Amino acid sequence: MINREQCGQFIDANTDNMVKDWKRLVEIETGSFDKEGLEEAADTLKAMFEGIGFRCDLIDTGAAGKTLTGILGREREGKPILFSGHYDTVFPKGTLADNPFRIENGRAYGPGVLDMKGGIIIAYYVIKALNSLGFTERPIKILFAGDEEIAHENSTTAETLVEEAKNCEFAFNMETGLPDGSLCVGRKGGITISAEVTGVEAHAGNSFETGRNAIEEMAYKICRLREITNLSEGITVSVGTIKG
């Protein structure tokens, strides 16, 4: 049984090191299309987790950032614990120059500091704390994606996550919690849908009745789609782009 007090003491004693590693990771710019930065971050994380006993693999995702998977204590008897997340950010290369990593009035700033390099560092130090206290009850697994901010387009990262999570006793996604500091125990999913509406061309003056206006039909469908939104159920539908 892990002693919570001892675990907390380990974290407190390593606060400075946590901030240093946090800073180091944030200062590697990892916009979802910055292949060079993503490669550096993936290699950095792989080395960090291998340094605390993990056996890691990097899964190529083509143009996007690689997916890092790893396991510690594969031979342990209990069902695994999984820590997951992503290391890509929404910030383009060069953002760091104007928004460097810094701590002001107890708050950290910088590209990806919250979403979600801070969460990865938390996972890393939680595992280090467990190692220091001799935790051997369960295997510990990690999965950190390099293409989350672009919804894993053209990659199998989502399928890899499902596979890695199978048979796990617990899974912790290291994204941020709620604004009041409380933990979030669920996230809603999302789906992207493309629809094409085709009209019938006709002269608006001479042959109005033979035509079918695709713009009007699309407007009608947008209104119907909006009716699906149900805020009390957490369901939202947003039409983002119209072309034609």
Please describe what each predicted stretch is.
Residues 2-111, 132-135:
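Acidic/His- and Gly-rich active-site-bordering loop/insert found
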Residues 23, 46, 121-128, 159-162, ...:
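Predominant activation on well-ordered alpha-helical scaffold segments within soluble catalytic domains
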Residues 29, 83-86, 123, 142, ...:
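Buried hydrophobic positions in well-ordered alpha/beta secondary-structure cores of metabolic enzymes
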Residues 85-87, 145-147, 172-177, 195-200, ...:
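Fold-independent oxyanion-binding glycine-rich loops
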Residues 87-90, 95-96, 177-178, 187-190, ...:
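Short glycine-enriched loops at secondary-structure junctions
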Residues 91, 107-121, 203:
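Glycine/serine-rich anion-binding loops at beta->alpha junctions
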Residues 116-188:
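Acidic/histidine-rich catalytic neighborhood of metal-dependent amide-processing enzymes
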Residues 185, 207-243:
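Acidic-enriched catalytic cores of C-N bond-cleaving enzymes acting on peptides and small amides
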